[in-house]
From Swiss-Prot:
The gene is PTC1. This is PHD finger protein PERSISTENT TAPETAL CELL 1. PANTHER family: PHD FINGER PROTEIN MALE MEIOCYTE DEATH 1-RELATED (PTHR46201), PHD FINGER PROTEIN MALE STERILITY 1 (PTHR46201:SF1). Probable transcriptional activator required for tapetal programmed cell death (PCD) and degeneration, and pollen development in anthers. GO terms for biological process: anther wall tapetum morphogenesis; cellular response to brassinosteroid stimulus; microgametogenesis; pollen development; pollen germination; pollen wall assembly; positive regulation of DNA-templated transcription; positive regulation of programmed cell death. GO terms for cellular component: nucleus. CDD domains: PHD_MMD1_like. It comes from the Eukaryota.
Length: 679
């Protein structure tokens, strides 16, 4: 269970007095509440933002908490509160971030601070019980010897609409997000995601990762949206494939999405019709509603998702057949057209088995026993298609194999229950009368497609050319880690924004070369801002200050020199020796922090972790799927070779407990082949 931090807050009346009120939809847009400088990066911008926040009176000790009042609506007044908690990592019992290790950032140095951005579900609950959130984001799963079944989300994050954490160096994680379907009273998931994206952009966050386990009902959104749009739901905000899971690399992931999304409906529907009449009818229904040709499974799912978003209470699916009488080519009376339409329906009702698709010629031959006028019959057959006749909807489609029109009946109650209850189609008017498709009905159709085509495909979709479907679905579902690089468009601005002759400050990209430290002590480049007249010596000491304040492992770092600049040049101005915006390497050493005689402290310091994924003994991951490091999925450790591998790859189902004694396949074979000794 992840350790939690609880922040006690003051009373609502005391906290709200004199606070600023910010517009939710505009918060952290350019210039609101401030213009954030790109040069200093996240570490400087977050301090600027917190200067506009309210410092919570109930917080004591080293942990600090600020809050912002965000106004959703003015009439009626609706306000939510965003909290920002500054966590001192040195004082934390869990310094390492498991999410960094799972996304592949295990080599990142541990920062001195982490900032948690929290949007509680209900402010009143946070005031009464305190602000509770996880400080160790293991979330279950991963390289642990535990025997728990499957993986779980962090329980303390479920109580928040938003929980994001950003390390002081600008790398962060979106831990939790819940919209209206996840318990929010006022704010949708899109609005919360927009807010988080604006905060990250404004504060010049570098890269943000997330684990996508979002669902809509029983449907995995990363699969549903992946097939429909070629990307996850978070893709509209720029989140892309982050790292392999179960050995699924980026090319395989992209190919799986392409295979599923481009599956032709003209090939898929005939195979489905052999096992289920409902699926072809669903496809035909939305093909008729769309008004344009839906060629692939991706086209169909994308249309259904977009239709759901804009579906009014009285959307359309079918039309009263009497509307065909207004067509210019109709030269028959209403009574004769009505008789012909009912004859067609009777012919379809007598089809065996029920609800099967019947060719146009079969319907025509059966109806001719009652309608002698072949011209009238041909007109009705040509015009009927997704029209309501009595208590039935006449569906029509073209068989992609035979190229012949086929007809089928669907009970009108599946389109509009009120029509069936009221005894058929209303009698008023002879123009086209449209009937509604509710969102609940569309969702039922969507779940039906998802279940029988993607999640639990029938036998028709597990062999031959369709055998790739289950494999592609598994690969798409295996990828859960996604990242967004906010630093792409900011690097150029940071290097060129300010600096050079005529500017009061210069910005330099600096990193460190630690001469006596571990190879792990290799921090990323940071922007160091100096006065335009600063000397090389001042550059050296400023770089020392920035890096020692940012990383725990560099607190004792002492700068010796600037690589490429002689020791006799330290008193010279930086401008002229170093180009503005260029990369600068400062060389130095990490001071001794332990007493050589204190053996106990020495062992403790040697075991202390300086990186997010180090310390406590390096784990060796060697899985049959090709994984070589911890990807956050449930793993087990071999009791002989001590190599970790996925429990799923070892044949242990997610619903099963891991065995107390576990042997990998290689060690198991070695034990079996070991010669026996007879005493």
């Amino acid at each position: 269970m992840a350790p939690k931090m609880v922040i006690s807050l003051g009373s609502s009346r005391r906290r709200k007095r004199g606070e600023m009120l910010f517009r939710f939809e505009a918060f952290c847009q350019p210039g609101y509440p401030a213009n954030f400088a790109g040069a200093g990066g996240f570490r400087d911008n977050v301090r600027t933002l917190l200067g506009f926040a309210h410092l919570e009176a109930g917080v004591h000790g080293e942990t600090k908490c600020w809050s912002f009042q965000l106004e959703l609506h003015r009439h009626p007044p609706t306000v939510v509160r965003l909290f920002v908690v500054e966590e001192e990592v040195a004082a934390s019992p869990h310094r390492q971030c498991h999410l960094c290790r799972h996304i592949g950032w295990g080599r990142h140095l541990i920062c001195s601070k982490r900032y948690h951005f929290l949007l509680p579900r209900r402010e009143s609950a946070a005031e009464a019980d305190g602000l509770c959130f996880a400080i160790n984001h293991g979330g279950g799963g991963g390289a642990e010897k535990a025997s728990s079944k499957g993986t779980t989300t962090t329980a303390s994050s479920r109580g928040h609409l938003l929980h994001g954490v950003v390390h002081l160096n600008g790398y962060g994680h979106l831990v939790a997000l819940h919209g209206l379907e996840g318990g929010s009273d006022f704010v949708s998931g899109h609005q919360i995601m927009d807010l988080w994206d604006r905060i990250c952009s404004a504060l010049h966050v570098r890269t943000v990762s997330l684990v996508d386990t979002a669902r809509k009902g029983h449907m995995e959104l990363r699969l549903l949206h992946g097939v429909a749009y070629g990307e996850t739901w978070f893709g509209r905000w720029g989140y892309r494939y982050g790292r392999p899971s179960y050995g699924v690399a980026l090319p395989s992931y992209r190919q799986s999405l392409h295979v599923l999304g481009s599956m032709p409906l003209c090939v898929l529907v005939p195979h489905l019709s052999c096992f289920s009449q409902e699926l072809p009818m669903v496809v035909t229904k939305y093909q008729a509603i769309s008004g344009h040709k839906l060629l692939s499974l991706g086209d169909l799912l994308r249309f259904m998702l977009e239709l759901r978003a804009r579906l009014p209470a009285t959307s359309v699916t079918a039309m009263d057949y009497r509307g065909i009488m207004s067509e210019a080519s109709c030269r028959w009376s209403a009574k004769r057209v009505d008789m012909a339409a009912r004859a067609v329906v009777d012919a379809l009702r007598r089809a065996e088995p029920a609800a099967r698709w019947v060719t146009r010629q079969e319907v025509r031959d059966a109806a001719r026993a009652y309608i002698g006028d072949t011209g009238l019959l041909d007109f009705v057959l040509k015009s009927l298609g997704n029209h309501i006749v009595g208590n039935y909807v006449v569906r029509r489609t073209m068989n992609p194999v035979t190229k012949v029109l086929e007809y089928c009946l669907e009970d009108v109650s599946s389109v509009l229950p009120a029509v069936a209850a009221g005894g058929g189609v209303p009698a008023q008017g002879k123009m086209r009368v449209r009937f509604q498709l509710t969102r609940a009905q569309l969702m039922r159709d969507l779940v039906h497609l998802y279940r029988h085509v993607l999640k639990e495909p029938s036998q028709a979709l597990t062999g031959g050319a369709f055998g790739a479907i289950p494999v592609a679905v598994r690969m798409v579902l295996d990828i859960k880690h996604f990242v967004k690089d906010y630093h792409e468009g900011q690097a150029a601005a940071s290097s060129n924004g300010g600096g050079g002759f005529g500017h009061p400050h210069i910005n330099l990209c600096c990193t460190l070369l630690v001469s006596n430290g571990s190879p792990e002590l290799a921090p990323p480049y940071e922007t160091v801002t100096l006065p335009a007249h600063a000397t090389v010596g001042e550059l050296k000491w400023e770089a020392q200050r920035v890096f020692s304040e940012m990383y725990l492992g560099l607190r004792s770092f002492a700068a010796d020199s600037v690589v490429g600049v002689g020791a006799d040049q330290e008193g010279l101005p930086v401008l002229g020796l170093v180009d503005v915006g260029s990369a600068v390497v400062v060389q130095g050493s990490v001071g001794e922090q332990i007493n050589g005689e204190d053996h106990e402290r020495k062992e403790e310091a040697a075991a202390a972790a300086v990186c997010e994924g180090s310390g406590g003994g390096e784990r060796v991951v060697d899985c049959a799927c090709g994984a070589v490091d911890d990807d956050g999925e449930r793993m087990a450790c071999c009791d002989i070779c001590e190599a970790w591998q996925h429990t799923r790859c070892a044949g242990i189902a997610d619903t099963e407990d891991a065995p107390h004694v576990f042997l990998c396949s290689r060690c198991d074979n070695d034990v079996v082949s070991f010669p026996s000794f007879n005493c």
